[in-house]
Amino acid sequence: MQPTNFHDQLKFAWLAGFVDADGCINAQIVSREDYLLKYQVRVSLTVFQSTTRHFILLDIQKILGCGTVRKRNDGMSEFCVVGGTSLQTTLEKLLPYLQLKRAQAKLVLQIIKKLPNTKDPSVLMEAALLADKVGLLTDGKKRTILAENVRECLKKLGHVV
């Protein structure tokens, strides 16, 4: 879903610059005891700013028409879009303009296509492997749950993956 007019193109190019500089496109594997397969792959886009510039994140939310903005306790604010359709639409708009985080965006878009079918053990495993690839491209925290943890759990549950 490409922006069609020049004004929209400028807005999304500006926003992509923000994401490249002060944002994070991420996929993480989350333990979920209430899930049949015990794991979920969660995808998100987050942009951080000092709370003194909180208004910029509100502008981003308005431009995209989705996401949440919150003030943290450490003097920072964050804008976040989590999961599915909203994130897919957002990444598709930003993809032509992303530079540093283009590879992460492409991988997360692949994961999003798999999300509706992750109750299938093999699809969950594919999504987890893609999440590991996203993790290799990010500068964030060390991951505690990897695709190998998902594979081991699925085997214990009697699934061949």
UniProtKB/Swiss-Prot annotation:
Its main location: plastid. The keyword Nucleus does not apply. It is found in: Plastid, Chloroplast. GO terms for biological process: intron homing. Gene3D superfamilies: Homing endonucleases. Keywords: Chloroplast, Endonuclease, Hydrolase, Intron homing, Nuclease, Plastid. GO terms for molecular function: endonuclease activity. Pfam families: LAGLIDADG_1 (PF00961). GO terms for cellular component: chloroplast. Its EC number is 3.1.-.-. Probable endonuclease involved in intron homing. Belongs to the LAGLIDADG endonuclease family. This is DNA endonuclease I-CvuI.
